[in-house]
Every structure is written in structure tokens, then in C-alpha cells.
Amino acid sequence: MKIAIVNDMPLAVEALRRALAFEPAHQVVWVASNGAEAVRLCAENTPDLILMDLIMPVMDGVEATRRIMAESPCAIVIVTVDRQQNVHRVFEAMGHGALDVVDTPAIGGGNPQEAAAPLLRKILNIGWLIGEKTARSRPAPAAPRSTASRQRLVAIGSSAGGPAALEVLLKGLPRHFSAAIVLVQHVDQVFAAGMAEWLASASGLDVRLAREGEPPQAGAVLLAGTNHHIRLLKNGTLAYTAEPVNEIYRPSIDVFFESVANYWNGDAVGVLLTGMGRDGAQGLKLMRQQGYLTIAQDQQSSAVYGMPKAAAAIDAAVEIRPLEKIAPRLLEIFPK
């Protein structure tokens, strides 16, 4: 994989070079010391992946991510020495299309290969995404269920560009929205709690991490909060599970959407937002096959038109809408 490094700290650049050296297939094609230089170099020689720092002179990593995704799009992973201190910048960069975030590998002390493992694992997953691997087979649709209980659920999946898209969508809903909401965003569990707090502050809604064994409830927005998959069980409660182990991203949107299609006893809407790859497309199609309304974000409003495009390609979405039109549509479907 052709990889670029954007970082103004020589020690951090060296740490990344050493980590990448453990995988001979990775090649560092260029290094930039600030965001402006990265924008220029990316236009001249677009890599497969950029390892982007956040705090740099001239232009920071957030603005560089925005510019690159608009002008010379490619996969971007935020690499920082202090994720917790930079949590809001991380979400902003992810809103512009960054795929993931990881700590800068340490130099000195301990096992260097072990220190490099988290970064190399994320790069491996992204390699699968940008390689557009064939979609995995899915279980056959379950038999239609009675919806006499009339419980209401909105199942939302998002990835690159998701934090900003979720902020817009949730701001368009009232605090006492009549449907339960469950969010599956591709984000490391280290950041899940911070993301829930950020979305709650931005939207004014009750956004929190989903807890094992609790049912989705109207008025609550539950965010998948671990690196395991979240799924709906037959009894209507939520559970975290390591299976299936072959899913590239954890938590998987497909896994959750499929569980909703199979086990939700009520009315539901599936919403697939911006993101790279195709996670969520097959699950959304299964929801549609079960008679649920399904919505995909349109290309123009998507930071990364990957997952919604995959859904549109297999006719998984009943409706394709601009981001700003999705919340009003949900209010039409589930009025007070």
C-alpha cells in the first residue's frame, strides 16, 4: 500500500516509518510537515492512505483532511499522541471524511512490533475497504413478523464523515422524538463515550452508549460503544458480540441492520449515511425485503459516497435523500 505521512514532529515520523517497516507491502511515498504541504503533495501524487497528525503549523490536520477529501480524496487515518485531549478535533476530522484514529506508536521500551500492531491492524482493515472486496454472503430473510406492538425504531449506520452527518440529522429531531434511535458509527471504543457526549451536547438529545441487555426506547439515542458488534436479540434487547469475526469493521452496520430485520417487532426505518466501503448495504437491503422503509444519503451531501452508493447499487434504499432532508422525513414517518 502507498502511504503518506503528515506530521511536523521528526520523532513521530520516525515512529511511523518504523511501524510501517514491519509490513514490507507498505511503502512511504511522501512526508509532509504541515497540512498545506500535504494538500499540494496529495494532488500531485495521491496515495492509498494518509497518516494525518492533527496539530501542525500553517494548516492543521482537520483543515487538511477537509481539503484533501474535497480535492484529491483518499483514505485518511488520524494519528495523534493524545487522542483524549484532541477528541473534538478528531470528530471534526472524521466529519470531513477521516476513517479512523490511532495513537502514534511509541519509540523505545517494550516490544516495537507490539507497539505497531494497532496501527498495522487498522491499515489492514482499510486495505480491505479500499480494495472493494466482494460482499460476504448474508442469511436469508426471516419470515415477516407481526407489528401489532407498533414500537418504533430508527436504525442508523455511518462511517467516514459520520460524526458531522449525525450531528446534522440529530439536530433536526425533537428531544422527545417518538421513536427509539440506535447508532452504529465506525469509531474505536476509546472514542465512543466522548462521541456520545459530543453528539448529546450538539443536538440536545439524550445520546449515550448502548448498554448490554437494554431495549431501545423512545426518546433515547443509543450509540454502539465497544469494538464488538451490537445486535438486537429475539427478546428485543441489545447485546454485544464478537461474532461474526470476519467482519472488517467493528461494530458492523450490516450485523445490526440484519438483526433489526430479523427480530424487531414493530415499525422501523433504516438509514445509511456517508462512509467508505459497503458496510450496511446488505443489511439495509434485508430491512427493505422485510417491508421496512430504508433511506440512503445522497452523493452530493455525503463526505464519502461509498456505503450509500453500495446500497443504491443493490436497490437497498427505498429513498435516497440529501442529509438535511432525512430528519424531516423521519418526523413525517414517526410524528408525535
Swiss-Prot record:
Domain Response regulatory residues, every copy: 2-119
Q: What about PTM?
A: Phosphorylated by CheA. Phosphorylation of the N-terminal regulatory domain activates the methylesterase activity.
GO MF annotations for this entry?
A: phosphorelay response regulator activity; protein-glutamate methylesterase activity; protein-glutamine glutaminase activity
Q: Where is the CheB-type methylesterase domain?
A: 147-336
Matches recorded under SUPFAM superfamilies: CheY-like, Methylesterase CheB, C-terminal domain
What's the main place this protein lives?
Answer: cytoplasm
> An example of a Gene Ontology BP annotation on this entry?
chemotaxis
Q: Which Pfam families match?
A: CheB_methylest (PF01339), Response_reg (PF00072)
The active site is formed by S159, H186, D279
Please indicate which superkingdom the organism of origin belongs to: Bacteria
Q: Name one GO cellular component term.
A: cytoplasm
Where is the protein situated, by its record's location annotation? Cytoplasm
| Annotated catalysed reactions | [protein]-L-glutamate 5-O-methyl ester + H2O = L-glutamyl-[protein] + methanol + H(+); L-glutaminyl-[protein] + H2O = L-glutamyl-[protein] + NH4(+)
Which family is this protein grouped under? Answer: Belongs to the CheB family.
Instruction: Cite the domain annotation text.
Output: Contains a C-terminal catalytic domain, and an N-terminal region which modulates catalytic activity.
Task: Please describe what this protein does.
Answer: Involved in chemotaxis. Part of a chemotaxis signal transduction system that modulates chemotaxis in response to various stimuli. Catalyzes the demethylation of specific methylglutamate residues introduced into the chemoreceptors (methyl-accepting chemotaxis proteins or MCP) by CheR. Also mediates the irreversible deamidation of specific glutamine residues to glutamic acid.
Q: Which NCBIfam families match?
A: PRK00742.1 (NF001965), PRK12555.1 (NF009206)
By what name is this protein known? Answer: Protein-glutamate methylesterase/protein-glutamine glutaminase 1
Q: Which organism is it from?
A: Pseudomonas fluorescens (strain Pf0-1)
Encoding gene per record: cheB1
